[in-house]
Amino acid sequence: MARKLSKNVKNAKAQVNKTDVFSLLEAIELAKKISFAKFDESLDIAINLNLDTRKSDQQLRGAVALPHGTGKNVKVLVATDEVSAQKAAKDAGADYVYTAAELPEVLNQDKYDFDVIVADPKMMLVLGKYGKKLGPKGLMPNPKTGTVTTNPAKAVEELKKGKANYRADKGGIIHASVGKKSMDSQKLVENAETLIQTIKRLKPTTVKGTYVLNITVSTSMGPSIKVKID
């Protein structure tokens, strides 16, 4: 199996010239064309930025609503003690709604059946105790991604419609999924453009010189394909 996978990866890479640069649509269509996985891979984008993430004002992190969703059914857990907020969250499509008293039993489990936690600010006292467990899994709620909020129902609606979370790593590169391979290419382009334009608008004032260094797209298991920067 490993040999077959290695061969597939080599074949996919052989179809991409590292020096070639494509329009966003061309890059996405090529990524889909050379995909060899038998499952519906994510279509990922990597945006390399001229950032010094040691500086607090250059640590980009947030979430953006994608016009055509992510193609993924996101399971959302809402944490709140407010009865009205609990009902509103359920009506909005939350998969799980728990109070502060109920959270420990859920969070102490080895495996979780949810992708995102949306929390009322008051719940952070409880959730903070599980930071070492939730943080590495990317599950700790954060105001910058809209997952710490006094309006959990609205956050649930946005997550269910499809939001892309983004965060610059230590090297200043933002990795995000903008949809699934099975989605229409033009819709994937519009999703990717939404993220790119959002990142451009968030350029820190302290950044000097070229801001966006390069952009690549790929499927989950495919090679990176360079995109022209406008």
From Swiss-Prot:
Pfam families xrefs: Ribosomal_L1
Record-linked Gene3D superfamilies: 3.30.190.20, 3.40.50.790
PROSITE patterns in UniProt: RIBOSOMAL_L1
InterPro entries for the chain: Ribosom_uL1_bac-type (IPR005878), Ribosomal_uL1 (IPR002143), Ribosomal_uL1-like (IPR023674), Ribosomal_uL1/biogenesis (IPR028364), Ribosomal_uL1_3-a/b-sand (IPR016095), Ribosomal_uL1_CS (IPR023673)
Keyword terms of this UniProt record: Repressor, Ribonucleoprotein, Ribosomal protein, RNA-binding, rRNA-binding, Translation regulation, tRNA-binding
MF terms in GO: rRNA binding; structural constituent of ribosome; tRNA binding
CDD domains given in the database record: Ribosomal_L1
One of the GO BP terms on file: translation
One CC-aspect GO term: large ribosomal subunit
Assembly behavior: Part of the 50S ribosomal subunit.
Similarity comment: family membership: Belongs to the universal ribosomal protein uL1 family.
Annotated function: Binds directly to 23S rRNA. The L1 stalk is quite mobile in the ribosome, and is involved in E site tRNA release. Protein L1 is also a translational repressor protein, it controls the translation of the L11 operon by binding to its mRNA.
Name listed for the protein in its UniProt record: Large ribosomal subunit protein uL1
Native source organism of the sequence: Metamycoplasma arthritidis (strain 158L3-1)
Gene behind the chain: rplA
